[in-house]
Amino acid sequence: MALATEPADLTKERLMDAAEGLFAEYGIEAVSARQIALAAGQRNQSAIRYHFGSKDDLVAALHAQRITEINERRAELLDAPGVASDMRALIGAIATPLAERVERDAGGSAYVRFLAHLFSDRQRRDLLIEHGESAALLRRIYADLRRLASAIPEPLFSERLRLLVGGIIHALADRERLRAKGGAGPFVLGQAAFVNNLIDAGIGILTAPPSPATLAHLASPKEHARGTNG
């Protein structure tokens, strides 16, 4: 149990670690501030309010801290020669830092599962792109991919990119959930092949020609009105 004299920074770290594990397992909405405090060994049930302000503030702080390392690796990949003209490398810059984080230590598994819950929460999803460095890197990736997939009209491209990013996050998270429940699970592919296959699938998502049916719906004023409303 955490000591009353424990430094504030260490207490905050304990709270974030506990929150990440609980969010990964049960989802963000299902976990209370009280549960997080107890899991972190805090006797004071208002520890979240004292150190962060609210549970939402804790979620934001947790994501901001964890994404820093991901962003550093992503920037490194994007700065490699020729990446701006290589769709596979650009999609790899989305997937690879997350996959590497998962493989490096057990905390990476909890992080990617937490990230999947965050991405699925429409009200919190903007946290994924509002972090300053994240926003700049994602704009850079978007611009390069948009240029390379110029044959795909809007809003199809933006929707496909959202599906691509969500698919990568959820595929990694689902794999980690299987691992967490006991061993390797029914995995056909090793981790490296799994990630490369994700990237291959991403290329297909972004470049597959839209069908006449999709284009017809895209041209329908009724379809645009429905999309605007939700």
Where are these regions (language model features)?
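An amphipathic alpha-helix adjacent to DNA-recognition modules
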Residues: 12-17, 52-75, 79
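Short alpha-helix boundary/capping elements
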Residues: 44, 56, 106, 119-124, ...
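Amphipathic alpha-helical packing segments from all-alpha helical-bundle domains
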Residues: 89, 107-110, 123-149, 159
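C-terminal peripheral helix-coil segments that are non-catalytic and often amphipathic
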Residues: 135-230
